[in-house]
Amino acid sequence: MIDALDGQPAFLEFTYVTNPGAAWSLFSDYPEALTLLASFALISIFLFRKQLELERHVLQIVFGLIGGGIAGNLGDRLFREPDEVVDFIDVYLPLINYDYPIFNIADSAIFIGAIVYLIIGFTDPKTKPNP
């Protein structure tokens, strides 16, 4: 990942790789289990949408990001051989000289949705117990 202009690593590149595992290739020996887990997660979000308070607009966005990311990676697993997702976003962090693991847009959606959900959980007065 070297920029042709100045010989320095580029901040962002697109690199095609496939990944049978989850984030950072975790559980790459169990792609079928990840497919089942993703299916279960999508079905659970749909079945428990009332309990998840999905009538609230911000939570619709959050679970839209999470569900869309899960669906995107699940689509790759179901329709690509052999049960792998395509990752292509390659980010280099020059300040700490770190080449972040390659990921995709679905991974980003899941991550952003989960972070926003945690922030809501810690800051939303509806989630705080009544004294």
Give the ranges of each region predicted by the language model.
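Alpha-helical transmembrane bundles and membrane-interface segments of multipass inner-membrane proteins
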Residues: 1-131
